UniProtKB/Swiss-Prot annotation:
Keywords of the record: Cytoplasm, Methyltransferase, rRNA processing, S-adenosyl-L-methionine, Transferase
Protein name, UniProt field: Ribosomal RNA large subunit methyltransferase H
Subcellular location: Cytoplasm
Documented EC number(s): 2.1.1.177
Pfam families assigned: SPOUT_MTase (PF02590)
Self-association and partners: Homodimer.
Main location: cytoplasm
GO CC aspect terms: cytoplasm
Taxonomic placement: Bacteria, Pseudomonadati, Pseudomonadota, Alphaproteobacteria, Hyphomicrobiales
Length: 160
């Protein structure tokens, strides 16, 4: 299953980008052994519209246009469902085992996500109740993707 990340806003050079890249690289190298492949990391600039609702709508339109037909869409939102790492790994494994070809994880802009995305999403997850800066969200989800691969493969990286 091809796994991608869609993010509103561009990650600038620096330690956050380097760390996210390190975990995405680990995921890309280890994932194929368990049927997961890093498809792409797509960034789009934040909308310059004058109000939040229009910005969210424009950002959602870009994401929805980029989704392959039949893709699984996972939204990251602080109001989403919290999963532990094993449950997240099992979720990815379940979509893979159902024969899903593409899965996209989406990080919204500073204004949040448009209702059209919630309507289209298969799952909305959170990385905890706290609000995180987008730079850290990318790093956290990259690490969790790598961790999911290690859980699915029985690698000792994940210890409980």
């Amino acid at each position: 299953m091809r796994v991608g990340l869609f993010a509103v806003g561009r990650l600038k050079s620096g330690p956050e980008k380097d760390l996210a890249a390190r975990y995405f690289d680990r995921f890309a190298k280890a994932g194929p052994a368990v049927g997961l492949e890093l498809a792409r990391i797509a960034e789009t600039a934040e909308s310059r519209a004058s109000n939040a609702e229009t910005r969210k709508r424009e950002e959602a339109a870009i994401l929805l246009k980029s989704l392959a037909e039949g893709s699984v869409l996972i939204l990251l939102d602080e109001r989403g469902k919290a999963l532990d790492s094993e449950a997240f790994a099992n979720l990815l494994g379940a979509y893979r085992d159902q024969g899903k070809r593409d899965l996209m994880i989406a990080i919204g802009g500073a204004d949040g996500l448009d209702p059209a995305l919630y309507d289209r999403a298969d799952v909305t997850l959170c990385l905890g109740k706290m609000t995180w800066p987008h730079q850290l969200v990318r790093t956290l989800i990259a690490e969790q993707l790598y961790r999911a691969v290690t859980i699915l493969s029985g690698h000792p990286y994940h210890r409980v």
